[in-house]
C-alpha cells in the first residue's frame, strides 16, 4: 500500500468513527430522572439520595408533612397519619390517587419509586402506580424494602401480598430489611435503616447503568 492509499484508508476510517460517534450521541439522549418517595420510608430514601447532589427531580408523597425538606424536594401530602397495625392484612386495596399525583407522570422522565412495604400509603401506592406506569409504557423502576421480622406476622402477610402483585414487573426490586439488620446486628436500629437507604440507592444505580444507553450516567451517579 503506497502513501496515497494509506491516507485514503485513514480518512475513511476517521469518517466511519465520526459517524459511529454521531449515531451514538443521537441515540443516547440524556436520561431525565425523577426520584419519588412513597410513604415515610420511601421519603427517607429520597432525602438520602438528595444529599448525593444528583441532578434529578425529587418528590416525596407521604404523611405527615416534612417541613424540614430542602426547597428542591417537592412534597405532596397523602395518606393518614394514623396507621392501625391490627388491620394491615385487610389493607390491600386501591387508594384514590389525586390529580396532583397523577400529573407527576405526564413527562417523559425515568421514574424511580422508592418505598418501604408495610405502611398503608407506600405499599398500596407503589402497587397502583407501577401498574399505571406499565400500562402507559412509561420508563420506571420500583424499589421497595420488606419489613423486619419483629414487626409481626400480620404486617408480614400484608407485605407478602403486595410483593406478589409486584413480582409481575421485571423492573421491581426488593430489599429484605431483616438481612440488613443481621448484617449490622451490632449497630443501633437507626443505623440499619440508614444502611437500607444506601442499599436502595445502590440497587437503583446498578440496574440503571445496565439498562440505560446514556454514557454520562456512570459519572453523574456517585458510588
What are these regions (language model features)?
Residues 10-13, 19-223:
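Tubulin/FtsZ superfamily GTPase core signature
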Residues 1-14:
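N-terminal secretory signal peptides and thylakoid transit peptides that target proteins
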